[in-house]
Amino acid sequence: MFKHSEYNLLETKKFIELTKSAMLNTEDFEKWNSIKAMFGIYTERNRGTYMLRPRFPAGLLNIEELEYFVNICEIYGEGRVHLTTRQDIQIHGLSIQKLIIVLELLLEKGYSSRSAGGHATRAIMTPPMSGFEEEIFDVTPYGDAITSFILENPDYMGLPRKYKIALSNNEENSLTAKISDLGLLAVEVNGIKGFKVYGAGGLGANPKESIVLKQFLPKEDFLYAVEALKNLFIEHGDRENKARARIRFILQKFGRDEFIRLFEEHLNEVYRTKSLKVFLEDKKEFLEEDIEVESIPNLFNGRIKGRYAYYLHPTNGDLSIKEAKILIEGLKKIPYNLELRISNTQGLFIRNLKGSSIEEFKNLVKDFSKNELENSIACAGSTVCNLGILDSPDMLRTILNHFKDKKELSDHLPKLRISGCPNSCSAHH
């Protein structure tokens, strides 16, 4: 479990106290309502309820943590555990009274939803197979370090707009890094490991692929890039026009060469004024070899022969309480440690499976997706999201039901990405 700092937990506690007073005082409610999104809280459409999004850095959690959140969703939520497209779990259907209870329960366990939404630095994306597959190096610790850094620095909240950062462990997993505000792609040049730095990308209205800001950055210098682009964003971001407030519009305004010059200028200033080098060890875990198994849908090889990862994808990212409890009890019976990683595709990677467990495991996950079509992604849609135009989850369910008994056809169909508005939460671009 990621360990939040005392400062971040204290700020979370202050917000909970404000939430309590907001129920009683109009002025406090207005203040609370203006900042609640930065604490991962959004109003649900026509319901009088809220959605809460706690942070799960790198999507990491263990079986006990998953069970804890399932219980919270069962008692206080609406009977489902929603896996998101940014490696988090969302709890839906919370009244303001239940929201306060859940916030306090999560704080007691050391969780925080701070900076999980709004005009803030969002969840740091890391590949869910990083540390398990062949790669330049495991970028997970770097994502955790960025998370710790931004949550210790208040100026990473209250930005002109959201600031999205993604890391990639190799070129094959580089897509997310190339469509983010800041992307850090692990590379090796002349035997030295570091990051290729991308910036000013994004989906939604006016989608744009990132540009290369720096061909090579020593891997211990990653926080300098994070800080430099944030400072550029604060200086040049448009706080008047929300529709043009993302970093990619700064690029559009100044052009490629000038934007890169501005980034270099800010980068040099951060190098001059701050000490942000972080040296992290590459961890290579060597495990005993196990038996190999034949390829099955959603099963992936790891870099250790005989170790596997399974991608579990519930429809629309929604695990029912019943499904989740059956899954948890089954995972508990596996007599060795498993690693769980929430993906950015509304799914869950179950890592470190031994070949000897696969047959039993297949029975446990038999009711989940078995092909690319069933791995499709749909955003929250118009029944929940205030911005939604289309009921995208229902559309996906209708499509999947149509092909339910047509396996000879559906096995050859691609994954769909359905967004209920132009914001591209399903990454349909």
Regions found by a protein language model. Give the residues of each.
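Terminal amphipathic helices with adjacent charged low-complexity linkers/tails
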Residues: Q97-K98, L107-K109, I234-I296, N352, ...
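Acidic, glycine-rich loop-and-beta core segments that form the ion-binding/anion-interacting portion
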Residues: E265-Q346
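Small-residue-enriched alpha-helical segments and adjacent helix-cap loops
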Residues: S21-E27, T49-G194, Y224, Y310, ...
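Generic structural signal of hydrophobic/aromatic residues within well-ordered alpha-helices
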Residues: S5-E6, T12-K20, I35, I146, ...
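Mobile "lid/hinge" segments at catalytic clefts and subdomain interfaces of large enzymes
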Residues: F2-H4, M157-R261, H429
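Short amphipathic beta-strand starts and helix->beta connectors
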Residues: I35-I41, Y68-E78, G199, N231-I234, ...
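N-terminal basic/disordered segments at the start of proteins
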Residues: M1-E65, N173, D181-L184, N190-G191, ...
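Short, flexible, solvent-exposed loop/turn segments with mixed acidic/basic and small polar residues
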Residues: I41-N46, G77-L83, E235-E240, L299-I304, ...
